[in-house]
Swiss-Prot record:
Family recorded in the similarity comment: Belongs to the complex I subunit 4L family.
InterPro entries the record matches: NADH_UbQ_OxRdtase_chain4L/K, NUOK/Mnh_C1-like
GO CC field: NADH dehydrogenase complex; plasma membrane
Main location: membrane
Cell location: Cell inner membrane
NCBIfam families: PRK05715.1-2 (NF004320), PRK05715.1-3 (NF004321), PRK05715.1-5 (NF004323)
Gene, per the UniProt record: nuoK
Topology versus the membrane: Multi-pass membrane protein
Quaternary state and interactors: NDH-1 is composed of 14 different subunits. Subunits NuoA, H, J, K, L, M, N constitute the membrane sector of the complex.
EC number from the UniProt entry: 7.1.1.-
Broadest EC class assigned to this enzyme: translocase
Function, in words: NDH-1 shuttles electrons from NADH, via FMN and iron-sulfur (Fe-S) centers, to quinones in the respiratory chain. The immediate electron acceptor for the enzyme in this species is believed to be ubiquinone. Couples the redox reaction to proton translocation (for every two electrons transferred, four hydrogen ions are translocated across the cytoplasmic membrane), and thus conserves the redox energy in a proton gradient.
This protein's name: NADH-quinone oxidoreductase subunit K
Source organism of this protein record: Laribacter hongkongensis (strain HLHK9)
Keywords, comma-separated and alphabetical: Cell inner membrane, Cell membrane, Membrane, NAD, Quinone, Translocase, Transmembrane, Transmembrane helix, Transport, Ubiquinone
């Protein structure tokens, strides 16, 4: 039987992997977006684990709101990525400094 601690350790490992992915990869925008999404999924995993452990549905409902915001963030991030690739022909984060408004 899996306890709450198992779920929290798994979520902490997922969160640590995503933070490590953000710090180690500073070049590719797609990998950065994937790491941020993994971070949000780890937080959602914690919400679901606590909601199941305490028998409350508020955590599960809050996950739907977080997933909605994450989907919007992904859509906006990918739209910005397409515009960057059209203008600069690259998706490197280092080249974002060339954008002038």
């Amino acid at each position: 039987m899996l306890t709450l601690t198992h779920y929290l350790v798994l979520a902490a490992v997922m969160f640590a992997i995503s933070v490590l992915g953000i710090f180690l990869n500073r070049k590719n925008v797609i990998v950065l977006l994937m790491a941020i999404e993994l971070m949000l999924l780890a937080v959602n995993f914690n919400f679901i684990a606590f909601a199941h452990y305490f028998g409350d549905t508020a955590g599960q409902i809050f996950v739907f709101f977080v997933l909605t915001v994450a989907a919007a963030e992904s859509a906006i991030g990918l739209a910005i990525l397409v515009v960057l690739f059209r203008n600069l022909a690259t998706i490197n984060v280092e080249d974002l400094g060339q954008l002038k408004g």
